[in-house]
Amino acid sequence: MAGGVTSGSAEGWSKRFEEGLHPVIERFNASISFDITLLQEDLDGSIAHARMLGECGVISLEEAAQLEGGLEKIRSEAAAGEFQPGLVDEDVHFAVERRLIALLGPVGKKLHTGRSRNDQVGTDLRLWLRRRLDDLDCELERFQHALLTQAESHRQTLIPGYTHLQRAQPLCLAHHLLAYIEMIQRDRDRLKDVRGRVNISPLGAAALAGTSVPIDRQNTAAALGFECIYANSLDAVSDRDFAVEYTAAASLVMVHLSRLAEEVIFWASEEFAFVRLSDRCATGSSLMPQKKNPDVPELVRGKCGRVFGHLQGLLTMIKGLPLAYNKDFQEDKEALFDTVRTTKDCVEAMSILMEEGLEFCSERLAAAVESDFSNATDVADYLVAKGVPFREAYQLVGAVVKRCLDEGILLCDLSLEQWQEFHSAIAEDLHEALAPKRVVAVRISEGGTGFDRVEEQLRHWRSRLDSVLS
């Protein structure tokens, strides 16, 4: 493209450039197709910057008002579908500036005074992520409510507890669901911590060294709701720690969702049959008419990989970058945008699954906890209470279990005489101690699955979650 700069994406560059970009390079270089996501935040940041320039006397108050009016006009055009940036704009920042100049003429060219796209994009990204963090927290709270409602419906329902995916000890189903509420609360706490480091303003750091223009960074930070400003301009435009931290925290959210999803998939299988999936949250087979597939938890489990991949991608992208800004940073947007969208979608889907997508099969669960050896530990505890050393009791119960397995019976099938062949301290009250509900009820340690302890936790979480709503 000889004869001067003709590429639209080069219009914001200096006259050092005599030729426009090669069309392929122009497409390769542009980010407008995805960073248009930041339009509202770009307008918010630009309005705060324009007001500050006016208040500091860098431009007149009248010019600042004109700039704000033009930016709000662009917002209105975008809402009406009339603002249509293209490849010619390269990115959202140039798109806004180009339209502003078209609306205001020379005054529009004053907006970028004392600012670089380097601090501008950092500001936009933080504003955008801050809002999405708040949205995600609301979704996670909804998920906790859904889990709690299910738990409250199953105060007395038992479910086998597993270690190594082998039957271990019976649990109160509410206790099992409460465990996920605890996990999600840790996620919410982590994300709140991340939000604190997102909420720092880089605006005014300019390209990397600050600016000679007499701006007021505290002014724009306060106007945009940031807690403080970056103390070092070089760090301000170089930092993407917050994006990594968010993606790491989101990865843990996905881990917790995936663990529950995995359990639901098992529970919904005919081999377990612990839950029934509703028609609204399951799919069928194109070939096998009897199938009802757990697609929701399977997709949640599968989508973990893309979030984990984004975390690895961000770390790999940042690790070798010299200070300050590098074009590599353009690669943070799609990773971050997709992580936010995927995580929120998965939390929402799992909330719906818990709210209306599955029903626990109480009869099947009751039969499951009555047909195994998950009460074996209670025999050992019974013997310990009779004065038998634990390790001796442990070995003795192992021998009893072996005999039962050899004979194809359960512990509850042994007569008192058969029990006493193993130890004379065993009395008639052992059979009561082996009842599944008794096994659960006696787990009275703080945080345990005993019904009284579970009631305490149900009341705690109901009070805690309801207090947020009131």
Curated annotation (Swiss-Prot):
<dbReference type="Pfam" id="PF00206">
    <property type="entry name" value="Lyase_1"/>
</dbReference>
<keyword id="KW-0456">Lyase</keyword>
<dbReference type="InterPro" id="IPR020557">
    <property type="entry name" value="Fumarate_lyase_CS"/>
</dbReference>
<dbReference type="InterPro" id="IPR009049">
    <property type="entry name" value="Argininosuccinate_lyase"/>
</dbReference>
<keyword id="KW-0055">Arginine biosynthesis</keyword>
<dbReference type="InterPro" id="IPR008948">
    <property type="entry name" value="L-Aspartase-like"/>
</dbReference>
<comment type="pathway">
    <text>Amino-acid biosynthesis; L-arginine biosynthesis; L-arginine from L-ornithine and carbamoyl phosphate: step 3/3.</text>
</comment>
<protein>
    <recommendedName>
        <fullName>Argininosuccinate lyase</fullName>
        <ecNumber>4.3.2.1</ecNumber>
    </recommendedName>
</protein>
<keyword id="KW-0028">Amino-acid biosynthesis</keyword>
<dbReference type="GO" id="GO:0042450">
    <property type="term" value="P:arginine biosynthetic process via ornithine"/>
</dbReference>
<keyword id="KW-0963">Cytoplasm</keyword>
<comment type="similarity">
    <text>Belongs to the lyase 1 family. Argininosuccinate lyase subfamily.</text>
</comment>
<dbReference type="GO" id="GO:0005829">
    <property type="term" value="C:cytosol"/>
</dbReference>
<dbReference type="GO" id="GO:0006526">
    <property type="term" value="P:L-arginine biosynthetic process"/>
</dbReference>
<dbReference type="InterPro" id="IPR029419">
    <property type="entry name" value="Arg_succ_lyase_C"/>
</dbReference>
<dbReference type="InterPro" id="IPR024083">
    <property type="entry name" value="Fumarase/histidase_N"/>
</dbReference>
<dbReference type="Pfam" id="PF14698">
    <property type="entry name" value="ASL_C2"/>
</dbReference>
<dbReference type="InterPro" id="IPR022761">
    <property type="entry name" value="Fumarate_lyase_N"/>
</dbReference>
<dbReference type="GO" id="GO:0004056">
    <property type="term" value="F:argininosuccinate lyase activity"/>
</dbReference>
<dbReference type="InterPro" id="IPR000362">
    <property type="entry name" value="Fumarate_lyase_fam"/>
</dbReference>
